[in-house]
């Protein structure tokens, strides 16, 4: 941007320091120095003849003004130097007027520029800047309701969404250092390219804060990993959808919940991060119910399913088990149905509690089916203490659960109409209910209640279904 040569001052009436230096600006002008004064609020307050109305803050934005007054020297249309606030020695050096403002205090701090007031900076960036956003703009007539327009265009999951204005999307993009145009991959079923900008748009609609955006991005990256088999998860007639588990320092930084009501409503980060992923699948990939999404019943968890792990336990965390350090933040995606509660309020030692958990796990998919799906077991704090007080590690609990979940082959009839199971080689011996890596233990939940939660999934069978996928959260 080419600037007027000479001196440029940016001021506002609503600033004691700007009022203080107004006579100084007159003094500069009378000394014959080329001077342009941009006034952010009331152009009539300054006595300088060369004042310019900058109430639209266009010049303040383009000049990058953060503090007023600011005095800038311009040579050949380019800024050479600037000073902020009132520092007599700096103003004198910049103007070449040694006695400038001799009767004023030696220095006085400036005030915040109107161009950086909360909510204003983003509006100016959208209006005058280069945001990097390229998504198609949709004009909404003034007489129409933005929220209703989102419903009518099919952008909603059935609940109201936040209309994704340019300003809101730009503000959301400030939550990451990644470029808006970066392509994360192709979202099934339509295999549409998904950019950071498109993720931000859907994060706005979901109700996310900008600081949640890196978590949403990582969740989208995990969902698009071929190992997760998102297309298959969408097309199945089974109940499942994506479930996001968050580990690392970002949990506390953005205020996630891993305690009471952890799988329920009430926490903005948990609710909106999971919802944002579902909206990306719907709005970018075209994964809509009764189209490609062929779930016979679905689950309320397909609105949103996201929570953080309780890392203040003696066990290794999910993230550590999957190769991350404690100081790294990560997401792990599972396919998941709704939770199945497991109550055991009597067991005070590990073995009977293992039998209770195994009894609940036996019901996953069908009590007479083995190795059909994986499951996540969310161990509540009171159940967790039973294991910890006995010195049991996570690995010991997993081994005991697998041992308790060996099913006799003759019990795998799955509701056959035959009076007795038909003998076959498959009925000999026992079968594991879950593959070796098919059980995952998570720590979370409220302090009161001898409960845990079983969360089954969909066909977690490697190449035949979906596998959990973890991604580091990058800011």
Model-derived segments and spans:
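Structural motif
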Residues: 10-14, 38-42, 380-382
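Thiol-based oxidoreductase modules, predominantly thioredoxin-like and allied folds used
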Residues: 32-57
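Short amphipathic alpha-helix with an adjacent loop that forms part of the alpha/beta core around
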Residues: 59-64
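Non-transmembrane, aqueous-exposed alpha-helical and coiled segments at domain scale
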Residues: 127-475
């Amino acid at each position: 941007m080419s600037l007027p040569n000479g001196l440029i001052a940016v001021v506002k009436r609503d600033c004691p320091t700007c009022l203080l230096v107004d006579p100084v600006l007159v003094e500069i002008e009378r000394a014959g120095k080329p001077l342009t004064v941009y006034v952010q609020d009331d152009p009539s307050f300054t006595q300088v003849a060369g004042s310019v109305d900058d109430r639209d803050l266009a010049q303040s934005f383009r000049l990058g003004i953060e503090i007023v007054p600011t005095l800038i020297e311009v040579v050949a249309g380019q800024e050479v130097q600037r000073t902020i606030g009132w520092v007599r020695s700096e103003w004198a050096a910049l103007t070449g007027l040694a006695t400038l403002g001799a009767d004023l205090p030696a220095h006085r701090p400036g005030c915040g520029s109107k161009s950086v007031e909360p909510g204003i900076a983003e509006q100016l960036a959208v209006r005058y800047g280069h945001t990097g956003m390229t998504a198609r703009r949709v004009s909404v007539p003034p007489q129409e309701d933005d929220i209703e327009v989102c419903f009518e265009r099919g952008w909603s999951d059935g609940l109201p969404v936040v209309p994704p204005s340019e300003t809101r999307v730009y503000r959301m993009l400030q939550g990451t250092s990644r470029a808006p145009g970066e392509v994360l991959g192709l979202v099934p079923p339509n295999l549409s390219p998904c950019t950071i900008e498109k993720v931000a748009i859907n994060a706005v609609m979901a109700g996310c804060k900008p600081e949640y955006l890196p978590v949403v991005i990582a969740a989208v990256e995990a969902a698009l990993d071929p190992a997760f088999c998102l297309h298959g998860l969408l097309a199945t007639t089974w109940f499942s959808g994506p479930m996001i588990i968050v580990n690392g320092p970002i949990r506390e930084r953005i205020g996630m919940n891993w305690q009471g009501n952890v799988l329920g409503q009430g926490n903005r980060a948990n609710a909106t991060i999971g919802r944002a992923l579902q909206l990306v699948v719907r709005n970018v990939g075209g994964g809509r119910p009764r189209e490609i999404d062929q779930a016979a019943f679905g689950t309320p968890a397909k609105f949103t399913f996201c929570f953080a792990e309780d890392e203040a336990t003696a066990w290794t965390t999910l993230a550590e088990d999957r190769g991350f350090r404690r100081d790294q933040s990560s997401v792990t995606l599972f396919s998941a149905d709704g939770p199945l509660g497991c109550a055991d309020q009597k067991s005070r030692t590990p073995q009977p509690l293992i039998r209770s958990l195994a009894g609940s796990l036996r019901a996953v998919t069908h009590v007479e089916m083995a190795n059909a799906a994986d499951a996540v077991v969310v161990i509540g704090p009171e159940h967790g203490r039973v294991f910890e007080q006995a010195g049991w590690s996570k690995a010991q609990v997993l081994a005991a659960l697998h041992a308790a979940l060996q099913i006799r082959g003759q019990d795998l009839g799955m509701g056959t109409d035959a009076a007795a199971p038909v003998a076959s080689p498959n009925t000999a011996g026992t079968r594991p209910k879950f593959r070796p890596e098919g059980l995952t233990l998570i720590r979370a939940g409220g302090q009161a209640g001898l409960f845990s939660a079983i969360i089954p999934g969909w066909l977690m069978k490697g190449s035949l279904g979906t596998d959990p996928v973890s991604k580091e959260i990058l800011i």
